């Protein structure tokens, strides 16, 4: 008999993922010993956490400030509000607000306590040392070449990722304006 299993291990940093992989391998070795079976392992692939680059972030922000913010139509505001009413959102619409009190106060005021359907404002420049969870190959790229990231509004405030609401918003003027 033969059996195969695929484990996908996720952690915030490459170093933590390597440690967790070693632990999972030991667990598999223990299971093989208990069942008197043979074990072979093969590493297939991995992704890296993004390396932050303050200089690039500052340059992107400097240019972002010069671009006019999107102006949404009444229909887009109504659509965003209708979508926002289909999911529960807790807290303020900004990861940075969770880690910085000044940002939290800014976002609270700009979003009327998180009630606004769209974030129609530019956040102050914020550099975070916190690695946010997510699936992206931007981390891999950042280990090879200078890389910076910006976030822009392409969906209603606090829309859950990987949701039908996110997909629905992706074909609207809200998303298109946010990307331009």
Residue ranges and their predicted role:
Residues 1-180:
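Metal-dependent amide/peptide-bond hydrolase catalytic core
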């Amino acid at each position: 008999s033969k059996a195969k299993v695929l484990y996908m291990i996720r952690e915030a940093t490459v170093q933590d993922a390597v440690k967790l992989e070693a632990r999972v391998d030991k667990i598999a070795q223990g299971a093989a010993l208990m069942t008197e079976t043979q074990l072979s392992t093969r590493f297939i692939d991995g992704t890296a956490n993004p390396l932050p680059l303050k200089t690039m972030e500052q340059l992107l922000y400097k240019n972002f400030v010069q671009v006019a913010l999107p102006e949404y139509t009444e229909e887009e505001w109504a659509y965003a509000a209708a979508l926002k009413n289909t999911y529960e959102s807790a807290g303020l619409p900004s990861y940075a607000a969770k880690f910085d009190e000044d940002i939290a106060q800014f976002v609270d005021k700009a979003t009327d306590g998180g009630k606004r359907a769209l974030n129609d404002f530019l956040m102050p420049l914020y550099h975070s040392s916190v690695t946010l969870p997510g699936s992206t190959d931007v981390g891999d790229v950042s280990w090879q070449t200078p890389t910076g990231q910006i976030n822009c509004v392409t969906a209603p405030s606090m829309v859950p990722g990987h949701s039908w609401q996110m997909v629905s918003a992706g074909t609207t003027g809200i998303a298109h304006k946010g990307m331009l």
